[in-house]
Amino acid sequence: MESYQNQSGAQQTHQQLDQFGNPFPATTGAYGTAGGAPAVAEGGGLSGMLHRSGSSSSSSSEDDGLGGRRRKKKGITEKIKEKLPGHHDSNKTSSLGSTTTAYDTGTVHHEKKGMMEKIKEKLPGGHH
């Protein structure tokens, strides 16, 4: 059988493209299709550009309008660290005052012992 593809007598299908280069579906013209071109609404869109607002939350300090600066809001990690016992920043002061009495003068400072030191203490004759 002969193939009529790409020959002068063959019917060629020309694929139509819209304004963005996308192909239209092939239409035969039957059942009331007017011209085969789809209706494209033009105007009022974002035209592919993202628009951002002028506000930003990434700055560490910002102008308060009165010539001063405001401090940055605390993040979640700072809030958690604040609630944990132990190390706190040196610029923070505690509201508890330290009072000493006469019987507090004989305090003994105990060092934390490692596991090997604890085992060595339990061995007989091994107190070095």
UniProtKB/Swiss-Prot annotation:
One of its GO terms (molecular function) is metal ion binding. Residues 1-128 are annotated as: Disordered. This is Dehydrin Xero 1. Disulfide bonds: none annotated. Belongs to the plant dehydrin family. GO terms for biological process: response to abscisic acid; response to cold; response to water deprivation. Induction: Not induced by low temperature, abscisic acid or drought stress. It comes from the Eukaryota. Residues 23-41, 48-60 have a biased composition (Low complexity). One of its GO terms (cellular component) is cytosol. Residues 75-91, 107-128 have a biased composition (Basic and acidic residues). It comes from Arabidopsis thaliana (Mouse-ear cress). Residues 1-19, 92-104 have a biased composition (Polar residues). PROSITE patterns: DEHYDRIN_1, DEHYDRIN_2. It holds the Pfam family Dehydrin. InterPro entries: Dehydrin, Dehydrin_CS.
